[in-house]
């Protein structure tokens, strides 16, 4: 599992049927980091710090075996101090 920050929502209305209508979010490991798409089954909003899992754990976390995801949000962090030496510039 890794910690990410939610950057913004991602709108994709035309999807394969298996993806259903689960929300998709753009997340980054740090400000200015590479954007990644994560499935959001927990209800996050931009600016939230979240815990994500990847690989087969990401598929299992959606609740649908074989779901086409390699990054899924599994929790919203209530309180977390960003380390002082972390690059948080945008």
Swiss-Prot record:
**One Pfam family matching this protein:** EutN_CcmL
GO BP term (any one): carbon fixation
UniProt-listed InterPro entries: CsoS4A, EutN_CcmL, EutN_CcmL_sf
Keyword Transferase applies: no
**Cellular component aspect of the GO annotation:** carboxysome
Alphabetical UniProt keywords: Bacterial microcompartment, Carbon dioxide fixation, Carboxysome
Q: What induces it?
A: Induced by growth in low levels of dissolved inorganic carbon (at protein level).
Q: Where in the cell is it found?
A: Carboxysome
What's the chief localization of this chain? other
Domain BMV: from-to ranges: 1-78
- Give the domain note: The tight homopentamer forms a pore with an opening of about 3.5 Angstroms in diameter which is positively charged.
Function as written in the Swiss-Prot or TrEMBL entry: Probably forms vertices in the carboxysome, a polyhedral inclusion where RuBisCO (ribulose bisphosphate carboxylase, cbbL-cbbS) is sequestered. Has been modeled to induce curvature upon insertion into an otherwise flat hexagonal layer of major carboxysome subunits.
**Family under the similarity heading:** Belongs to the CcmL/EutN family. CsoS4 subfamily.
Q: How does it assemble?
A: Homopentamer.
Protein name, entry field: Carboxysome shell vertex protein CsoS4A
């Amino acid at each position: 599992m890794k910690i990410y920050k939610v950057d913004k929502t991602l709108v994709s209305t035309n999807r394969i049927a298996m993806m259903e209508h689960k929300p998709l979010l753009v997340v980054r490991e740090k400000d200015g980091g590479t954007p990644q798409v994560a499935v959001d089954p927990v209800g996050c909003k931009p600016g939230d710090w979240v815990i994500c899992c990847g690989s087969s754990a990401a598929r299992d976390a959606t609740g649908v075996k074989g779901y086409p995801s390699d990054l899924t949000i599994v929790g919203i962090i209530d309180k977390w101090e960003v380390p002082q030496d972390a690059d948080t510039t945008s």
